[in-house]
């Protein structure tokens, strides 16, 4: 035993070589057709010969046609009997479940019987030919009025041969029947299970054998009468009368009828005890041979094993309602009542097929199916595969297919139309669902957990609960789909927004890079310079007083350099644009290329009016800051004109020539600073103009037009040196001439040259407010 894909057990011998068996069957059918054609041709030739020789050809033709019709009727009856026997044998096989060896023995017996049948057919053909030859000889002998004794002797010999041949055929048929009975008894003894159905079948077979024996006895008596009549006619030796012709025709008809009793293709032959060599073509089962003759060779549903055929028996309406007729207390789905009445043997077969077969391979799968279960299972969607598997081999293979619908729905309609009341239930009809059945699903779904003792109320509750579960699952799926769609839409909106932001960022970045490029290209050709780039607080190229410079630097630093908390700038630092002590041309040439600030610097013209004048102590020779190399910031002012200076300069000529010069401190600004405010108002110089057209150093001393001090003194023109310069009185006790060394030793010509001064605490702390000013840095310039 093996298990197929659905898990059901089936015999190994059912489908070993199905295609080869089909081919073998087709070959047998072709051979049978050829034999029939040969027989018909021989009969046709014999008829032609008889028509040429016999004067009563028309009557013979009529008799021959009647004989052919009778033979056809007999053939159809034999076919029906064969089908009934095949169905009985199939039922026996399903009940007994024989093993492979039993099937092989049955096949061997059947093949041996087939050989015997072929031999009997050959003998019958030879006998028939001999009989025809004897009849022709008898006709020739009796038809001629001038026949001699030799012809009469040949006729008698022919009749004797015919009698011997008929006796031989009858003996051979009796031997075959005896062998069949013995083999059937042996087969029944070998089988392990004999039920009531087998006993009924044996009784039916015995009745059939008795009927056949009676018919054979009648035929033998008729043959003997036919044998005596021609002999009498031949002994008389005269012409053949109409009575003798009728007798000959009857003899031929009986002979053909006896030939029809011979089996065809070994279907009625019983198995023998001998076992020939098994080949793939001879290894087949009785069930296969039955299906080959009764069903179509092209089964539409094959899944690795041979399924039962979907034969439509009876009336099938369009709405898949299957009519059923009751016979013997059991329900027979789709069987016509006329067939049951005309064929009494078919009742037993139908009863056996309608009921469940004990001991079959589908008994365990049929145990969980009750009446009304199929419709309940079809109302749900999770039991389609199980229903297909468990009912595909139920009720002896008789399944009802839908005649109006083809294709896949035939199988589902057949499943839905199977009558499940074969265990004795008296249901009259079984209506199935609509044609919307789908093919079975392999895998998935729930197994049918149907209890045998479940009440209809429990089944209804289960159905309602399943319907509610289905609706709840559908709502859950819909809710999940809606939530997924909402989230998807939200994600799409956010993605779109992010893309818009990215595009905006890209556009702004491109605009920024474009503006930077334009700014870079414009900075090299821009004509505007920052106002405080080269701003110098100078008066005709020289630095003004300390108080004025402090005010200017404080205002410029507070406007442009807010990070400098001390407002302290170096005199040589060119970063703030203010240069102390240098010429503007020198500052412009030594300045680095820094970014331009185009903001204008506004300086109030009234700034000079708020300059605080601090008193100076005449006792201190040096400035307030002792660590400076140059003079004090208060003494950094523009020198007056040399001409006026020489006129007002008074140099005493005495031994005190090396004394320090005492320069009086004026409380008012010199007259040369009158135009300082105008110079302050426009202090910014154009860098490009300075670079391209160098401005000559401003000449504020007018040394070219005037004579120096020493020349004026040496000239001796009798004029006294000037005592004041532009309103500033000059009182110098020194009368000596200062050379370069004396000027570079620390004096500027305006202060008395004396020994080195030691710093004191009073000199350091006397003017603390001047320290954070830009002019408190030591000056590195030398006044000439």
UniProtKB/Swiss-Prot annotation:
Residues 461-463 are annotated as: Basic motif. It comes from the Eukaryota. It is found in: Nucleus. Residues 97-106, 115-126, 198-227, 380-397 have a biased composition (Low complexity). Residues 365-378, 421-438 have a biased composition (Polar residues). Keywords: Activator, DNA-binding, Nucleus, Phosphoprotein, Transcription, Transcription regulation. CDD domains: bZIP_Fos. Residues 459-522 form the bZIP domain. PROSITE patterns: BZIP, BZIP_BASIC. SUPFAM superfamilies: Leucine zipper domain. SMART domains: BRLZ (SM00338). GO terms for molecular function: DNA binding; DNA-binding transcription factor activity, RNA polymerase II-specific; RNA polymerase II cis-regulatory region sequence-specific DNA binding. Residues 97-126, 196-231, 358-404, 421-464, 616-635, 759-784 are annotated as: Disordered. It holds the Pfam family bZIP_1. GO terms for cellular component: nucleus. Residues 464-471 are annotated as: Leucine-zipper. GO terms for biological process: embryo development ending in birth or egg hatching. The modification Phosphoserine is found at residue 594. Disulfide bonds: none annotated. PANTHER family: ACTIVATING TRANSCRIPTION FACTOR 3-RELATED (PTHR23351:SF24), FOS TRANSCRIPTION FACTOR-RELATED (PTHR23351). Belongs to the bZIP family. Fos subfamily. Developmentally regulated transcription factor AP-1 binds and recognizes the enhancer DNA sequence: 5'-TGA[CG]TCA-3'. May play a role in the function or determination of a particular subset of cells in the developing embryo. It is able to carry out its function either independently of or in conjunction with Jra. Homodimer. Heterodimer with Jra. The kay-Jra heterodimer binds more stably to the AP-1 site than either of the two proteins alone. This is Transcription factor kayak. It comes from Drosophila mojavensis. The gene is kay.
